[in-house]
């Protein structure tokens, strides 16, 4: 931001690459807005785009949850054909992941099951859901932007407590998707759309320039002018 100020840039648009409005997102947003409120840098606009999972699709707003589910299923479709997709999120107390499961259940992606490592829905609840669905072939997809080595080991490593091992122990045929959402071009497009929304919202709030209005003479003024001349 300091470099932008030195370059004479006074409008900045930031699109955080985050799934939910968690503590990291809020801290980043707070830090960025400090530059707007400081007279030292001269910014007139600092606008921050929303996380991937924000809008529920009510009152003519876009449905981020449905769009995210569609983007994931579309990207993994060749490998997920005739399989249930299990999304694993590294979440804690975020309601967005349970909302994502509800959106899937209500028709957006009925073959998708969501669980979190430290929150709700739990892995045990996902097992109950999978049992009711009756599908034995699964594709586990990390609901994370980066498919780190640690994450992939937790999902499909040779350790006895990996998600692969736990699901196989329950009698499922399991494949692991070895990419984060950040490599999904359809998810990338969703982030770009959020950035576009931030820009459009800023344009709507921008005060319209006043047009110069020429004075119009009334009849009485015209008559008075004629008498004077």
Task: Write out the residue ranges for each language-model feature.
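Extended amphipathic ligand-handling, pore-lining, and cofactor/metal-binding catalytic surfaces
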Residues: 1-139, 144-229
